[in-house]
Curated annotation (Swiss-Prot):
Name of this protein: Enhancer of translation termination 1
Source lineage: Eukaryota, Fungi, Dikarya, Ascomycota, Saccharomycotina
Locations listed in the record: Nucleus
Signal sequence bounds: none
Family classification: Belongs to the ETT1 family.
Function noted in UniProt: Required for correct translation termination and probably involved in regulation of hypoxic gene expression.
């Protein structure tokens, strides 16, 4: 399975969310939370746990950049714990899941100084805070699992927390010169653990026929978190290189801008990320379990499946097959049409016939899932289908019936999308008609 292309998710800085406005002190913010935090809860949220779930859902459906709201969730969990000190009523698994998730989420709000000469003491303090948040989150998960063994929601939450911990606590402080002996864990083994826990959640959901747990964007976040992590590893070190080049003369930057993505950062065998970067098993795991996710959604009554979840899973699968098709597609077009390769039998270990068949198969699969991701209210999803059809058409013989049929259908889709968006896709349509 092909590695993902640069730019699917932007390194660890995309995971560490910055506060847009700095408060003078965290203590002051905490003291004012009750009067500042106003959240509209869903209808029917009468009991305290339902209200907590509503608060949690409000955060999930937001931009997830509101530290005040996360602290509000944690304070509500603390209050529920205090009111239940006698243990007369056992708190449900979802309580522990929400509590742990919120504690882990706080790690994303730890300030990271922009100054180059950041004091070592400040770095250590920042790292310490992140570690404390994750330790507390994982401790809460274990408390929940003691009371609710193998609960699917708790297992899913634990898997997601571990993946976030890998990124923020273990990968974020690394440089290209880091060595395995410098950190306390083997990153790939911790990642294996996170994925094994998710697999256990799949098994337990299947045993209990609890497929509804997958009908949720929060659960789907795990696959996105893994995709982000793999993207960070694939492109590790490139961001620093780009930042250095930004300091160069603007004209030089423009001249060299097209070459940035071509730079390959080599990691030594004793680098903490070497195993993940050089293995394709994690990419394949992502693909396999995204398929499983879709299969689990299909086990629900179709009318109960959230359309946005179904479309998102299909979209991700479609895009992954398109990305995998890029190399064989390039090989085919190069060997078939590039005069510089006239007479060449192979490129990247593929003949023109092999590259053509592999590309056609992959893009046909991509089309299947992109059609499943189509949203009648979103012309962008129509254009995704049309562009895949054009790419597939390019892989057939010129003026063949297969090519003409694909181009014709793509043209109809683009015209419809263009009309719906006042000409937003005019360039794509004109390019198709010209060729």
């Amino acid at each position: 399975m092909a590695k993902r292309t640069l730019g699917l998710a932007k390194a660890a800085k995309a995971k560490k969310q910055k506060r847009e406005e700095k408060s003078e002190s965290p203590e002051k913010d905490s003291g004012n939370e009750e009067e500042q935090l106003t959240v509209e809860l869903p209808e029917g949220a009468t009991d305290e746990i339902s209200q907590l779930i509503g608060l949690h859902q409000t955060y999930l459906q937001s931009e997830r950049d509101n530290e005040l709201l996360v602290n509000g969730i944690i304070h509500e969990c603390d209050r529920l714990l205090r009111s239940n000190e006698d243990g007369k009523e056992e708190l449900p698994a979802i309580f522990h899941s929400i509590y742990a998730t919120a504690l882990a989420e706080l790690s994303k709000f730890v300030e990271e100084e922009e100054e180059e000469e950041k004091k070592e003491k400040e770095e250590q303090e920042s790292d310490k805070k992140i570690k404390e948040f994750f330790d507390a989150a994982l401790e809460r998960i274990e408390i929940g699992l003691e009371k609710h063994p193998n609960d699917v929601n708790l297992l899913i939450a634990k898997s997601k927390i571990l993946i976030d911990q890998i990124v923020l606590q273990y990968i974020s402080p690394l440089s290209v010169d880091s060595k395995k002996k410098e950190i306390e864990v083997e990153v790939e083994k911790l990642l294996d653990t996170a994925l094994e826990i998710y697999e256990l959640a799949e098994v337990k959901a299947n045993e209990s026929k609890n497929y509804e747990v997958f009908n949720d964007l929060e659960t789907l976040d795990i696959l996105q978190a893994l995709d982000d992590l793999l993207d960070i590893v694939d492109n590790f070190g490139k961001n620093n290189l780009e930042e250095e080049e930004e300091d160069e003369d603007e004209e030089t930057e423009k001249d060299n801008g097209d070459d940035e993505d071509e730079v390959e950062i080599e990691l030594t065998e004793d680098h903490p990320l070497y195993v993940i970067k050089t293995s394709d098993k994690y990419n394949q795991w992502w693909r396999d379990h995204t398929h499983t996710y879709l299969d689990n959604l299909k086990k629900l009554d179709s009318k109960d499946v959230l359309p946005e979840v179904l479309r998102e899973v299909n979209h991700r699968l479609g895009q992954s097959y398109l990305q995998e098709s890029e190399i064989p597609t390039t090989v085919f077009t190069t060997l078939k049409y590039d005069d510089e390769y006239d007479g060449a039998k192979e490129l990247e270990g593929l003949t023109v016939e092999e590259a053509q068949k592999i590309s056609q198969d992959l893009i046909s699969k991509a089309l299947k899932y992109l059609k499943g991701a189509k949203d009648e209210e979103d012309p962008e999803t129509w254009v995704d289908i049309a562009e895949a059809m054009i790419t597939l058409g390019n892989l057939h013989d010129i003026d063949s019936k297969e090519q003409e049929d694909l181009y014709k259908e793509a043209e109809e889709i683009l015209k419809k999308a263009n009309n719906a968006t006042n000409g937003k896709f005019k360039d794509i349509l004109e390019n198709l008609l010209e060729n």
